[in-house]
Amino acid sequence: MATPTQSPTNVPEETDPFFYDYATVQTVGMTLATIMFVLGIIIIISKKVKCRKADSRSESPTCKSCKSELPSSAPGGGGV
């Protein structure tokens, strides 16, 4: 067994500036993750609902996300 070469010194304990209440950090993190997840689902669903309401006989849908442009249809763009 090894024996210590120096006697332990009594250093006054200072408060750790990087002390975290991990239960609170975990609770806040899970709450924010849940809120962002639900908002993402709502945004995805709302965009799909807008596209479904567009008139199917119309050539241009009402929402921009439903339009699909081909790279060859861009002005000045060449074909494939």
Swiss-Prot record:
Membrane topology, Cytoplasmic segments: 46-80
Tissues showing expression: Expressed specifically in brain. Expressed in both neurons and glia.
PTM entry text: O-glycosylated; required for stabilization and translocation to the plasma membrane.
PROSITE patterns xref list: FXYD
Superkingdom assignment: Eukaryota
Keyword set includes Phosphoprotein: yes
Membrane topology: Single-pass type I membrane protein
Domain notes: The transmembrane domain is important for the interaction with NKA and with the functional effect of FXYD7.
Protein name in the entry: FXYD domain-containing ion transport regulator 7
Biological source species: Rattus norvegicus (Rat)
Gene behind the chain: Fxyd7
